[in-house]
């Protein structure tokens, strides 16, 4: 399951709308501590500048991975948009998926009034859709706690 903050979902959708009709792409980095928590939104430039394909700029991607390494982070979410189709990985998306522990998030912007956001694990060409839980904060997400600290 992907648990992700509302502000990060809003940022993905805004990026996808801004780059439409081209596919948007980016990464959400998080601590490399086993929490699987997306934290730092990193919109990237689609080097392909295409409505049907995305490609990270190799120099930008190298800089991002060096930055994540220096910050003890990992790519928790790798996202991109589909501008005219559903939010499901294409054969190319599946072939290029190289991070077996990342959540691959797709957002469809084919409807100008709404969006579809889905998350997948892609490992060795196998696509598994996973539930997405959108939360306001990770502080109390799925703990059974309320928003009021104990006295």
Regions found by a protein language model. Give the residues of each.
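Metallo-beta-lactamase
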Residues: 81
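Conserved beta-strand-loop surface patch within small alpha/beta domains used
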Residues: 1-75, 84-151
